[in-house]
Every structure is written in structure tokens, then in C-alpha cells.
Amino acid sequence: MANIVKTAFANMGWMMISQIIASVCAFVWTIVTAWYLGPSDYGIFGAAVSFAALFGIIIDFGLPTYLVRSISTDFDNEHIYLDNSISLKLFLAVFYVIAVYLTSMALGWENKLVMMCLLIAIENVIKSYHALLFSSFQAHEKMKYQAITNTVLNVLTLLFIILITFTDLSLVGIAFAYIFANFIALIYEIFALRKHIIKPKLSFDFDFYRVLLKAGLPFALNGLFYTIYYSIDLVMITHFSTTYATGLYNSAYKLITVLTLFYTIYSSVVFPVMSKLFKNEKDLLKLSFVKSIKYLSLVTIPISVFTMFYGFDIIQIYGAEYIEAGGVLTVLIWTVCFLFVNGASSLILNASHNEYSVTKIYSIAAIFNICLNFVLIPNYSVYGAAVSTVLSEILILFLQFYMVSKINQLPDRHLVFDLLKICFASGLLGIVLYFLNLNMWVAMPVSIVVYFAVILLVKTIDQEDKLIIKQIMGR
């Protein structure tokens, strides 16, 4: 237990450093891009990103998640898994780019939007290889090199975007900034993988392709439905409203994305650990699930409360043009709470070979989300899309907890009490913010002090948590 915890949190330490750098870079380039493009062009950019993501199942096909689970329990056959996945993606990439381009043309979109869809698709091909090679780092629990790759990628992206704004290369230039940054970071990633873990090569085993595609399909469908209800809103806003409205929604959504990057780190560290625990120690698997929900909620709920009060202040970092997006942010922020808890549930279901259950849940949520968008977006525009996303997350919460209960991993009443304590502390924080009515920058440190004082007062951190902290610190 001690070694598992220390390894997991050592990896998380590397990823956390990388994430801090990534979050700062993403925060800055999001503001710079939105400020440089303005709401309308920023809406085109957001629509292109979301539209290209809808076809992500073609290029991803669930291979990274499947490889993490397979390699982490079968290192001897890593070459077979990785080499064939690399070559398989070459074929998938061609189909993916063609599908994005032809579909965007068929929809009759303006040339600028079609061109952006094509460029973003090319970027996504490179990103898909990042995800594929990351699976090897994650399976070996050597997150240091993934962290360095992410740092290189995010720093280069920021530098290139700043360069584009100074040279005034417009919307297309922004797309090329992402492409070049991803390509250079991929070169480093390949070098690190070859030096420290394995030397991948191309292997064209068409029989094994069928094995990979069949095994990856449930993960791919899961990702597809997940992408649909997180990306379809921008596409539908563009269709039912204007690119200006899309730009407003995208500005709020991008801030949410910066926060959710923390979950990406957490899942990349915890999933391979959960896969091993399912095979060897199922009691510790449940413990990791319970603690995941507790620690993620400990962070996300107070952030959501704070944003609910200061959403209009936060959104002004983009400039006065985006002030209307403040209301959208105060609604969308609640998706973070549910997304993190739902993410932990997805991890335990995937790790315990119940990926088809996750696929069914996300398919139901995607259909639910699309139906809500058809009703709400034409009438309430960006606010309708935000409400639709939150309600979809709530639906997923109930469905996933039902499935978790069927594999006897449902948390006991102790977690319920912990969550009630976190909600109490967050609610008290909300009351303090309401009555004090402080400036946002003053409210930040005040909120931290008030929240953690209440957390300690109600004894949310128990002896088990303290033991985990000691193990992380090597005591």
C-alpha cells in the first residue's frame, strides 16, 4: 500500500508541476487568443475545435486507454501493442482528416470555417500520437517524461501564439501555432520513450489490428459520446445562433477547460494503479475510488461557489467584449464538480473491465444532451447550452453510481458524511462572500482561509487521510 501511494503521488508531483505550467500557459494564451480574435473569429475557432473533436473516435478509437490497461498488466507484450497501434493510426488518420473536411464542406459552412476545421483535424492527428505514446509512460508509471512533454508543448504553444499576434497572421496563424507546437513536442516524446522505456517501431499485423479495434471500441464509443455532449453545444450554437454567441460561450468554456486539466493529471496517474488493484487487491481499489471522490470534491466544490459569485469579474480578463459570458460561466462552473466525480466513477468502471457500462451511460447522456440543446439553445442561446451541459452531468452521476453499486464498489456512509462536510464548508463560504461583498482579489485569500478553517474544524481530514499524507511524504 505504501509503495503504491508513494509511486502514485510521486508521479502526480511531476504531473502537478507540469500542470501548473500548463495551466498558466493555457490561461495566458486563451486570453491572448480571445482578445486578438474578438468574439466572432473566436467563435469560428471554437466551432472548428468542437466540430473536429466530434470525429475523434476515428483517430483515437479508444487505443490509449486500452493500451494503458493492457501494458500495465502485460509488459512482455508491450511491443506488440504499441508498434501495431502506431501503424494502425496512420490509416485512421487519413480517414479522420477526410471525414472532417468533407463533412464541413457538405454543411455549407463558409470557407474560413472549413479551413479551420481541416487545420484543427491535422493538429488532432498529432495529438492522438501524443496520447498513444503517453500510454506507455502511464503503464510504466514514469510520468516524469509525460510531464516534460506537456511542459514543452504548452510553453511552445504560448510562445507561438504570442508570435502570431505580433505578426498579425490572423485565425489561420493561430491554428498553425498549435500544429507546430504539437509536432515539436512529439519529437521530444519519441526521443524520451526510446531512451527510457521502449524503442517503438512500425508493425503491420492486420490480424492484430482487429484485436485492437475490437478491444478499443467500447473506450472509443465512450469517448465519442463524452465528446458529443461536451462539443456539440458549440456546433449547435453556431448553427442556431451566431459565431458571436459561440465566441461568448467558448470564452467561458475555455476557463472551465483550464480547471479540468487537473482531472486529466489525476486520471492519468490513478487509472493504471486502479487497473493493477483490480487484478490484485480489490479492497484497495475501492479505497482509491472513495479517496478520489473525496479529494476531487474537496477542491472543486469551493471553486464553483467562488465562481458563482465572481463569474462576471473573472470573465472580464478577456475584455469588455466578453462581459455577457459571465452569466454562462456561473452556470458552467458546476459541471466541474460533477465531471470530477463522474470521472472517478468512469475510472473504476474502466479499470474493472466494465467499459461497456460507461459507454452506455455516455450514450444516454449524449442523446439527452442533444435533445435538451434542440429545445434550449433556440430559446435561450448560450444559457440554454450551459444548463443542458450541467443537467447531463447530473444524469451521468446517477447512472454511474448505479453501475458502481452493481460491482460492489459503492462508497459507504463515511464518504457521504465527508461530502456533507465539504458542502457545509462551501456553503458557509458562500454566505461569507455574499455578506462581505468583497473585491474579487481580496475575496480569494479570504475564501481560502475561511474554507480550510471550516474543513479543519469539522474534521474532514480523518486519520486515514493523515496516514496517506505521511506515506506520500515518506514517513
Where are these regions (language model features)?
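Small-residue-rich midsections of specific transmembrane alpha-helices
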Residues: 25-29, 46-71, 124-130, 223-232, ...
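Interhelical loop/hinge segments that connect adjacent transmembrane helices in multipass membrane
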Residues: 1-4, 8, 144, 171-175, ...
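Specific pore-lining/lateral-gate transmembrane helices of multi-pass inner-membrane transport
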Residues: 71-88, 248-363
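Transmembrane alpha-helical segments of multi-pass transport proteins
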Residues: 365-368, 414-466
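Helix-terminus/linker motif at the lipid-water interface of multi-pass membrane proteins
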Residues: 27-41, 165, 224-259, 272, ...
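N-terminal membrane topogenesis motif
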Residues: 1-25, 76-79, 83, 206-222, ...
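Hydrophobic alpha-helical transmembrane segments
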Residues: 114, 118, 148-195, 211, ...
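Signature of the first transmembrane helix
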Residues: 4-64, 97, 101, 154, ...
